[in-house]
Amino acid sequence: MLKARVITALVLLAGLLAALFLLPAFGWLVFASLICAVAASEWATMLGFGGASRHVYAGILGALCLASGTVAGLHQEATVAPFGLAPVYAVSALFWVLCVPFWLRARWQLPGRGAAALIGLVLLLPPSLAIAHLRLLSPWLLLGVMAAVWIADIAAYFTGRAFGRRKLAPAIS
């Protein structure tokens, strides 16, 4: 299992590095939008959306990411500073800081698929735009942020394997 994970990670890393350093700004924005669409498809599956509705939702979020990034200027090289992203990032930060802790503590159930779809928008669109934005600032900066996340994830995995007695989030893992 670990060997397959490592091989998969190396193949994906090679593709990511090629895209990160070789694609023009618009190509990277398209790449980030595709990542957003794939994540939206996964979110829709967790919500119980089936077949066409899952693909439509994923397509809408991917297109919205591409359109928002283009309007913000993320499709151009670094000569133009992106604008209009602060409110998007602020809404996301407020959601994570003010809503998510209470949501998890109270174990709130989503009121319906429509509300869950809107929450997916708040969960998926800002990070996708941030990936495009950080790459515009510096591919090395984005790679550093991603590496920090990867290192933390790998450390948590091995720490859990070595010292974990019970799962902290059995509903997730």
Residue ranges and their predicted role:
Residues 2-173:
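Membrane-embedded alpha-helical bundles of polytopic integral membrane proteins
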